[in-house]
């Protein structure tokens, strides 16, 4: 059966500053934690990325031409404040004013994120989000942006608190590359939620025009054996780590007692430690009802089996299917069920998980006013056809199938009462990916990273028709 989306449903592509802009040393931009981390550990760098810093006019033209009426972008904190605080760099401010003006000229509304994984180097080395003082710096940066860029109508404070903390302190594939530091993970979770809440209250108190929210990466967790109480418990614990701790903190304004007891058990099973949340519930409680939306980034779901052995995580950053492993003592292990497909990077493809997550948000958090799917997409090892002189289209039918299936469950959720207002495909064009460099491609538009030429994909044509008709076919 053909499904449709509401006429006011918005469509666009998503990007992020460090992944798209390139130009990491241009016009006085300060260094971020990733610059040193990549230099010391990898063969790829944050340059050239998609060179959005110089190509944004072309990319926004493509966004408009292929049906996008919104775009997700982020401000590079270190383009505004090269050191994270103190001196403002006028060149960076001017760039974003020009970028937003071009968005307006192209009738593409920007949803602007303040922090998307790119903490300035000095702040990162001085404790990053483990310290309350760095959240002061974040709030001051947010305040500056709210006042400097009144042309922005939609603000996102922080992108994917969970991903930042897990990759920095559990998996170790983000700087500073710690592993199994659950105390640091929970501390970072909490501090970022406090910073987010303070920024929201500041935005509302100052009477800034527009809307503000946060983006959470949410995934649905299922027991591997639905009849096994131990597997059910593992799924519930993983859900606490992936979803409940963060969404409760954001929209309930506190962590329930049973959550804190589970946190203590997880810490005890993994080298102990503790984190400090005293006297800060006032901030997150004050913001819980005044946020305008939540962004949901959805890529995968997980099936969990009980496990109490040694914690071990192997991250698949190469695209060699079947090489990942996640086993966490006191929580559980991820186990692939029969019949569930995965990407080359072992991300489970399960659209029903998005429906289940949307409906849980609707049912469990009635103070969430509306939802945007702020990232959804699939990475492939895309190539341009060999006969590119006559055929410059990337043939990515599997991506169309993936996006179509996820949009269909979004339509189902809307029909069942969920207030989902828009969809951002990750990504507008190919971008640098944090732990895969330039081999994993998501874009509606293929980027030749040597020449910076853009080539459309079949998905781009399909997406254009979708945006024009709102019919999923």
From Swiss-Prot:
What intrachain disulfides are recorded?
Answer: none
- Binding, D-galactose 6-phosphate: 19, 116, 159-160, 297, 433-434, 440, 442
Gene Ontology MF: a single term: 6-phospho-beta-galactosidase activity
Q: Which InterPro entries match?
A: 6P-beta-galactosidase, Glyco_hydro_1, Glyco_hydro_1_AS, Glyco_hydro_1_N_CS, Glycoside_hydrolase_SF
Q: Please give the biological process terms from Gene Ontology that the record holds.
A: lactose catabolic process via tagatose-6-phosphate
Q: Which family does it belong to?
A: Belongs to the glycosyl hydrolase 1 family.
Would you tell me the protein name for this molecule? 6-phospho-beta-galactosidase
């Amino acid at each position: 059966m053909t499904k449709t989306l509401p006429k006011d449903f918005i469509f666009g592509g998503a990007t992020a500053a460090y992944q798209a802009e390139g130009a990491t040393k241009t016009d006085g931009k300060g260094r971020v934690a990733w610059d040193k981390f990549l230099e010391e550990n990898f063969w790829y760098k944050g340059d050239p990325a998609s060179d959005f810093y110089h190509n944004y006019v072309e990319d926004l033209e493509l966004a408009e031409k292929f049906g996008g009426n919104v775009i997700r972008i982020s401000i590079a904190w270190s383009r505004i404040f090269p050191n994270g605080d103190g001196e403002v760099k006028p060149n960076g401010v001017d760039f974003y004013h020009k970028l937003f003006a071009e968005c307006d000229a192209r009738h593409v509304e920007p949803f602007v994120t303040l922090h998307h994984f790119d903490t300035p180097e000095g702040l990162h080395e001085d404790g990053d989000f483990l310290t309350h003082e760095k959240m002061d710096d974040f709030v001051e940066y947010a305040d500056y942006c709210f006042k400097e860029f009144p042309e922005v109508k939609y603000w996102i404070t922080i992108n994917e608190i969970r991903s930042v903390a897990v990759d920095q302190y559990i998996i170790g594939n983000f700087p500073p590359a710690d592993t199994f530091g659950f105390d640091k993970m929970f501390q970072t979770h909490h501090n970022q939620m406090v910073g987010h809440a303070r920024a929201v209250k500041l935005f509302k108190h100052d009477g800034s025009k527009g809307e503000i929210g946060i983006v959470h990466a949410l995934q649905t967790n299922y027991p591997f054996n639905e009849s096994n109480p131990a597997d059910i418990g593992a799924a519930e614990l993983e859900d606490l780590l992936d979803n409940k701790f963060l969404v409760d903190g954001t929209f309930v304004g506190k962590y329930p007692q049973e959550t804190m007891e589970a946190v203590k058990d997880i810490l005890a099973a993994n080298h102990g430690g503790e984190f400090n949340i005293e006297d800060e519930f006032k901030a997150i409680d004050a913001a819980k009802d005044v946020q305008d939306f939540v962004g949901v980034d959805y890529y995968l779901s997980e099936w969990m089996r009980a496990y109490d052995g040694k914690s071990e995580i192997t991250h698949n950053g190469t695209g060699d299917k079947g090489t990942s492993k996640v086993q966490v003592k006191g929580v559980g292990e991820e186990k692939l069920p029969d019949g569930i497909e995965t990407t080359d990077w072992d991300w489970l493809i399960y659209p029903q998980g998005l429906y289940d997550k949307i409906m849980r948000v609707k049912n469990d958090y009635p103070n969430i006013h509306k939802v945007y799917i702020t990232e959804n997409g699939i990475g492939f090892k895309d190539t341009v056809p060999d006969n590119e002189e006559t055929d410059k289209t990337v043939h990515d039918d599997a991506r169309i199938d993936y996006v179509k299936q996820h949009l269909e469950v979004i339509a189902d959720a809307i029909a069942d009462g969920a207030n989902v207002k828009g969809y951002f495909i990750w990504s507008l064009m190919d971008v640098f990916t944090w732990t895969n460099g330039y081999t994993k491609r998501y874009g509606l538009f293929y980027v030749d990273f040597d020449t910076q030429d853009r080539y459309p994909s079949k998905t781009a044509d399909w997406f254009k028709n979708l945006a024009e008709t709102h019919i999923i076919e």
